Structures are given as structure tokens and as C-alpha cells.
Amino acid sequence: MEYGALNHVAFTPGKEMLVITDLKSGRLKYYSIDGHYVKSVKLPYWFSRCEFITDNLIAGFWSGGTVIPGENKNYKPLLVVTDLLGNISSSAFQSYYRKEYTSTIFEPIRKFEDRVLYNNPNTDSIFLLTPNGIELAYHLNIKGAKPMIINEDITNDLLREQRRNNPFFNGDFVELKDGAIFHIFESGFPGYRFGIYSNAKQRTFCCDCFRYSPFFCFFDAPKARYGDNTVVVDTRSDIVLAYKDELYKLGKKEEIDEFYKDLTEDS
């Protein structure tokens, strides 16, 4: 069975299956790892992003908020934790979405190993989602930043004004085995800024854009985790080609030449 829209892809907790959030059909489509259709389950609520906390418990996000049966109709949480039958265990973070305010982030819910994490769009806090509730996992105290004020009066124009000359966390982060990395964005700033939190040191190390390793020539916002402590980024092939000589400074010419083998600007 084909899906109508590929809104989000998640693993089941044991990674036996891939699950596509298909808003066009309003269903979760289950596939085996090799791509064979397994089953389809009705979405309990209108979610554009879903991650599995357990086999029967999902965290769902919708930028317009979710109307919860039996609750105040004005309460429309961005985040809902529910079983597949629609029994809600947790919900939080009022949506202010409307014509004047449409800002969000691409991946508000992320999963690393068995930990499901949520970043409320345009804020500096990240929360851990569990069957027992929602708890603070990280709070970013960005040097020189003024906190964003997000309430019922917010508009796209007001948000842009708050972001002007103000560093902010834009939702790009990766949790690693021994820490986490967070992308910090600032309008007009010429370089890439990020913070690395160390579990062992229990402190954050900040990068202010000055690079001492050639790898940072094409380092960008973290997209995913690979293995225990490796961060995956994507960058254009022409940028990778432009910095080949910089990588030679590492002194591993044969390995670098193998890496660049068959790489072209059209790759």
C-alpha cells in the first residue's frame, strides 16, 4: 500500500518497522525495514510529526494545536502524548498559530536511541517525553541573547523583530551518547555557532565561529546522530570540493583522496 503524503518517518521502538505519518490519509503506515507494507493505523489526532515512546504510545505535534475532547476548546496544545486509541496521557504548550503567526520548526520532536525529546518552537528549552510525563532535559542560556516572548499577541513580524541582532536556538540539535550539540543562529552573523554539552563535565563548551580544524570548513547544522558520538551534517558537493586542500592539512592524503573519489559538483 502506498502512502499519500510523507510527513514524517519514525522507527518503532525495537526498530523492526518504519512508520510513515501520512496526513493525506490520516493514518500511520507501517512498513518492514526492507520496504514491504505491514499495516495501517488511524492517527488518533491530527499530527504532522510522530515519534514512538513505546509500541502503543506516541508523541504527536501539530502547529495549529490539538483540540482535546472534554477540555476547554481554547486549549490547543502543540504537543500531545497519547496511545493509538486516542487516550491522552500528557499535553502541553499552547498553540498561537493563526494567519498572523505561522512560525514553527521542521523537527520539534526528535528521537535518539530510546529518548524522545521535544523543543517547543522558538524557545530555548528541550523536554524529555516519557510514559510518566514531560520533564525538562535541557535549557539553553545563550550568552547575549534576549528571551523570545511568545504569547497570544505574537505575530510573524514581532518574532522577526525579536530575532534581529539576537542569537537564538532554532531547534537544530543532536543528543549523543556523551553529550549533545546545539546550533545557535544569529541573523547577519557570518559564521556557524554551536554549543556542545558534556555529560562528564556537566558544562557546555561554546564555538564562536573561529575554526581550528579543516572539518569546520563545511560544518553546518547537525541533522542526525551516527553511532555514539558522531554528528551527521549535509553540505553541497561544491563546498566539499572547494576545501579539499584544507583537509590535506590533516596529513592523511590517501584517505582524503579515497573520500573524494568520483565526487563532482553534480554529485
PLM region descriptions:
Residues 32-33, 74-86, 192-201, 267:
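Beta-propeller blade signature
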Residues 2-4, 40-45, 93-101, 139-142, ...:
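Surface loop/turn motifs at the tips and blade-to-blade linkers of beta-strand repeat domains
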Residues 14-16, 55-56, 113-115, 177-178, ...:
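Short coil/turn segments that connect the beta-strands within blades of beta-propeller domains
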Residues 226-267:
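Blade-level signature of beta-propeller repeat domains, shared across WD40, Kelch, NHL, RCC1
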Residues 73-133:
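Loop-centered beta-sheet repeat module
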Residues 2-8, 12-77, 91-98:
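Asp-box/WD-like beta-propeller blade repeats and closely related beta-sheet repeat scaffolds
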Residues 135-166, 199-228, 241:
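Conserved blade-ending motifs and adjacent loop-strand segments that build the rim/top face
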